[in-house]
Amino acid sequence: MGIPVVVPVAAAYSCSSSLAAPPRAAAAAARAPSRAHVAAAGMSSRASSFVGGSGGDLAAVAASVAARPRRAGSGGGGALGCKCLFGLGVPELAVIAGVAALVFGPKQLPEIGRSIGKTVKSFQQAAKEFETELKKEPGEGGDQPPPATPTAVSGGEEKGLEASSSKESA
Protein backbone atom coordinates (compact mmCIF):
# COMPACT_ATOMS: atom_id res chain seq x y z
CA MET A 1 0.00 0.00 0.00
CA GLY A 2 1.18 3.48 -0.78
CA ILE A 3 1.22 6.43 1.57
CA PRO A 4 -1.99 8.45 1.13
CA VAL A 5 -0.71 11.88 0.13
CA VAL A 6 -3.98 13.62 -0.66
CA VAL A 7 -6.49 11.69 1.40
CA PRO A 8 -9.23 14.38 1.59
CA VAL A 9 -9.28 14.84 -2.19
CA ALA A 10 -9.30 11.09 -2.80
CA ALA A 11 -12.09 10.64 -0.28
CA ALA A 12 -14.17 13.29 -2.04
CA TYR A 13 -13.81 11.49 -5.35
CA SER A 14 -14.53 8.07 -3.90
CA CYS A 15 -17.77 9.38 -2.33
CA SER A 16 -19.12 10.47 -5.69
CA SER A 17 -18.31 7.12 -7.25
CA SER A 18 -19.87 5.19 -4.36
CA LEU A 19 -23.30 6.56 -5.27
CA ALA A 20 -23.18 4.91 -8.67
CA ALA A 21 -21.64 1.57 -7.66
CA PRO A 22 -21.63 -0.78 -4.67
CA PRO A 23 -18.99 0.05 -2.00
CA ARG A 24 -16.74 -2.87 -2.98
CA ALA A 25 -16.75 -1.85 -6.66
CA ALA A 26 -16.03 1.78 -5.75
CA ALA A 27 -13.10 0.75 -3.57
CA ALA A 28 -11.74 -1.49 -6.31
CA ALA A 29 -12.10 1.29 -8.88
CA ALA A 30 -10.21 3.69 -6.61
CA ARG A 31 -7.37 1.19 -6.13
CA ALA A 32 -7.02 0.18 -9.78
CA PRO A 33 -7.91 2.97 -12.22
CA SER A 34 -8.82 2.01 -15.74
CA ARG A 35 -6.27 2.30 -18.53
CA ALA A 36 -8.16 5.26 -19.96
CA HIS A 37 -7.78 7.17 -16.70
CA VAL A 38 -4.09 6.33 -16.47
CA ALA A 39 -3.59 7.36 -20.11
CA ALA A 40 -5.47 10.60 -19.50
CA ALA A 41 -3.07 11.35 -16.66
CA GLY A 42 -0.17 10.85 -19.05
CA MET A 43 1.24 7.84 -17.20
CA SER A 44 1.78 4.25 -18.16
CA SER A 45 0.39 1.55 -15.90
CA ARG A 46 3.92 0.85 -14.68
CA ALA A 47 4.44 4.54 -13.81
CA SER A 48 1.08 4.79 -12.08
CA SER A 49 1.91 1.82 -9.86
CA PHE A 50 5.29 3.40 -9.08
CA VAL A 51 3.78 6.77 -8.20
CA GLY A 52 0.76 5.52 -6.30
CA GLY A 53 2.17 2.37 -4.75
CA SER A 54 -0.23 -0.30 -5.91
CA GLY A 55 -1.90 2.01 -8.44
CA GLY A 56 -4.09 3.42 -5.69
CA ASP A 57 -5.57 6.75 -4.72
CA LEU A 58 -2.84 9.01 -6.06
CA ALA A 59 -3.18 7.69 -9.60
CA ALA A 60 -6.97 8.04 -9.42
CA VAL A 61 -6.65 11.63 -8.24
CA ALA A 62 -4.09 12.42 -10.94
CA ALA A 63 -6.38 10.93 -13.57
CA SER A 64 -9.37 12.92 -12.37
CA VAL A 65 -7.36 16.14 -12.25
CA ALA A 66 -6.07 15.54 -15.78
CA ALA A 67 -9.61 14.90 -17.02
CA ARG A 68 -10.95 18.20 -15.67
CA PRO A 69 -11.79 20.84 -18.25
CA ARG A 70 -9.36 23.74 -18.29
CA ARG A 71 -10.12 27.40 -18.58
CA ALA A 72 -9.54 29.00 -21.97
CA GLY A 73 -7.01 31.50 -20.63
CA SER A 74 -4.91 28.98 -18.71
CA GLY A 75 -3.10 27.54 -21.74
CA GLY A 76 0.37 28.62 -20.65
CA GLY A 77 -0.27 32.28 -21.35
CA GLY A 78 0.98 35.19 -19.35
CA ALA A 79 3.38 37.96 -20.21
CA LEU A 80 6.28 35.67 -21.06
CA GLY A 81 4.32 32.53 -21.89
CA CYS A 82 3.06 33.18 -25.43
CA LYS A 83 4.20 30.79 -28.13
CA CYS A 84 5.10 33.11 -30.95
CA LEU A 85 7.31 31.39 -33.50
CA PHE A 86 7.62 27.61 -34.03
CA GLY A 87 6.51 26.99 -30.43
CA LEU A 88 9.25 29.21 -29.02
CA GLY A 89 8.38 31.67 -26.30
CA VAL A 90 9.83 35.10 -25.59
CA PRO A 91 12.62 33.83 -23.29
CA GLU A 92 13.81 31.30 -25.87
CA LEU A 93 13.82 33.92 -28.62
CA ALA A 94 15.79 36.29 -26.37
CA VAL A 95 18.44 33.62 -25.76
CA ILE A 96 18.68 32.88 -29.50
CA ALA A 97 19.08 36.60 -30.25
CA GLY A 98 21.80 36.90 -27.61
CA VAL A 99 23.74 33.95 -29.00
CA ALA A 100 23.41 35.35 -32.53
CA ALA A 101 24.77 38.70 -31.32
CA LEU A 102 27.77 36.97 -29.77
CA VAL A 103 28.47 34.78 -32.79
CA PHE A 104 28.00 37.26 -35.64
CA GLY A 105 28.91 40.52 -33.92
CA PRO A 106 27.15 43.88 -34.04
CA LYS A 107 28.34 44.76 -37.56
CA GLN A 108 26.85 41.74 -39.33
CA LEU A 109 23.55 41.51 -37.41
CA PRO A 110 21.69 44.23 -39.40
CA GLU A 111 22.76 42.65 -42.69
CA ILE A 112 21.66 39.19 -41.55
CA GLY A 113 18.35 40.62 -40.34
CA ARG A 114 17.71 42.23 -43.73
CA SER A 115 18.47 39.01 -45.60
CA ILE A 116 16.19 37.01 -43.31
CA GLY A 117 13.45 39.62 -43.80
CA LYS A 118 13.79 39.43 -47.58
CA THR A 119 13.63 35.65 -47.48
CA VAL A 120 10.50 35.66 -45.32
CA LYS A 121 8.90 38.24 -47.62
CA SER A 122 9.62 36.12 -50.70
CA PHE A 123 8.16 33.03 -49.00
CA GLN A 124 5.02 34.97 -48.10
CA GLN A 125 4.70 36.26 -51.66
CA ALA A 126 5.13 32.75 -53.11
CA ALA A 127 2.53 31.38 -50.70
CA LYS A 128 0.10 34.14 -51.66
CA GLU A 129 0.61 33.46 -55.40
CA PHE A 130 0.11 29.74 -54.83
CA GLU A 131 -3.11 30.42 -52.94
CA THR A 132 -4.49 32.67 -55.70
CA GLU A 133 -3.65 30.05 -58.34
CA LEU A 134 -5.45 27.39 -56.34
CA LYS A 135 -8.51 29.61 -56.12
CA LYS A 136 -8.42 30.30 -59.89
CA GLU A 137 -8.08 26.69 -61.10
CA PRO A 138 -11.60 25.41 -60.32
CA GLY A 139 -13.22 28.37 -62.11
CA GLU A 140 -11.02 28.18 -65.21
CA GLY A 141 -11.90 24.58 -66.13
CA GLY A 142 -15.43 25.42 -67.38
CA ASP A 143 -14.63 28.72 -69.16
CA GLN A 144 -12.10 27.48 -71.71
CA PRO A 145 -13.30 25.64 -74.83
CA PRO A 146 -11.87 22.17 -75.37
CA PRO A 147 -8.72 22.06 -77.53
CA ALA A 148 -9.28 21.62 -81.27
CA THR A 149 -8.57 18.09 -82.47
CA PRO A 150 -7.29 17.54 -86.03
CA THR A 151 -9.96 15.99 -88.26
CA ALA A 152 -9.24 13.25 -90.77
CA VAL A 153 -9.42 14.16 -94.47
CA SER A 154 -11.89 12.09 -96.46
CA GLY A 155 -10.68 9.95 -99.40
CA GLY A 156 -12.37 12.10 -102.12
CA GLU A 157 -10.55 15.26 -101.09
CA GLU A 158 -7.19 13.49 -101.17
CA LYS A 159 -7.77 12.35 -104.79
CA GLY A 160 -8.70 15.87 -105.80
CA LEU A 161 -5.50 17.20 -104.26
CA GLU A 162 -3.41 14.58 -106.04
CA ALA A 163 -5.02 15.37 -109.42
CA SER A 164 -4.40 19.10 -109.07
CA SER A 165 -0.77 18.56 -108.13
CA SER A 166 -0.22 16.20 -111.10
CA LYS A 167 -1.67 18.81 -113.50
CA GLU A 168 0.76 21.44 -112.25
CA SER A 169 3.77 19.16 -112.66
CA ALA A 170 2.87 18.26 -116.27
Swiss-Prot record:
GO terms for molecular function: proton motive force dependent protein transmembrane transporter activity. It is found in: Plastid, Chloroplast thylakoid membrane. GO terms for biological process: protein import into chloroplast thylakoid membrane; protein transport by the Tat complex. Residues 106-170 are stromal. Residues 130-139 have a biased composition (Basic and acidic residues). Residues 62-84 are lumenal. It is a single-pass membrane protein. The chain crosses the membrane at residues 85-105. Keywords: Chloroplast, Membrane, Plastid, Protein transport, Thylakoid, Transit peptide, Translocation, Transmembrane, Transmembrane helix, Transport. One of its GO terms (cellular component) is chloroplast thylakoid membrane. Residues 130-170 are annotated as: Disordered. Disruption phenotype: Seedling lethality after the development of three to four leaves. Non-photosynthetic mutants possess near normal pigment levels but lack one or more elements of the electron transport activity in chloroplasts. Defects in protein targeting across chloroplast thylakoid membrane. Gene3D superfamilies: 1.20.5.3310. Residues 1-61 form a transit peptide. It holds the Pfam family TatA_B_E. Belongs to the TatA/E family. In thylakoid membranes, TATC and TATB form a large receptor complex, containing about eight TATC-TATB pairs, which binds the precursor protein. Twin arginine signal peptide promotes pH-triggered docking of TATA oligomers to TATC-TATB receptor complex, inducing a conformational switch of TATA that results in activation of the translocase. TATA dissociates from TATC-TATB upon completion of translocation. Part of the twin-arginine translocation (Tat) system that transports large folded proteins containing a characteristic twin-arginine motif in their signal peptide across the thylakoid membrane. Involved in delta pH-dependent protein transport required for chloroplast development, especially thylakoid membrane formation. TATC and TATB mediate precursor recognition, whereas TATA facilitates translocation. HAMAP family: TatA_E. This is Sec-independent protein translocase protein TATA, chloroplastic.
